[in-house]
Each structure stands twice: as structure tokens, then as C-alpha cells.
Amino acid sequence: MAEIPKAPIARIIKDTGAERVSEDAKAELAAYLEEVARDVAKEANNVAKIAKRKTVKADDIKLAIKNL
């Protein structure tokens, strides 16, 4: 189940020029973005662990995105 609110998802889609966005479209994009976010978070956590830190920092996120 998607946890990302649907309103920002609809805004993102509408910013591309879409006039209307179906509920299914919002749900699909939200689910995909959550999956990608989880992958990035896992990798960032690994980066922090390698650096012997418990805290995930912005630089860990940036490096995780590059690694994926």
C-alpha cells in the first residue's frame, strides 16, 4: 500500500502537462517511487554502516543514488 500522499503525486504528473490523473495512475507512481526510495535508503544505510555510523546523512543518500 502506498504511503506517499496522492496529492503531490498528482501535482508531479500534472506538471508534465496532464489535465487529469486517475487514482490508479497516482497509486502506481506512488508505489514505484516508494520502491525506489526503499532501495536508495537500503544502500544509504549500507554506506553509513561501512563508515561505522548509525546515522544516515545526506551524503550517504547522494552516494547511494550514484551506486544504484
Predicted regions mapped to residue ranges:
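Terminal helix-to-tail segments of small alpha-helical proteins
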Residues: 1-68
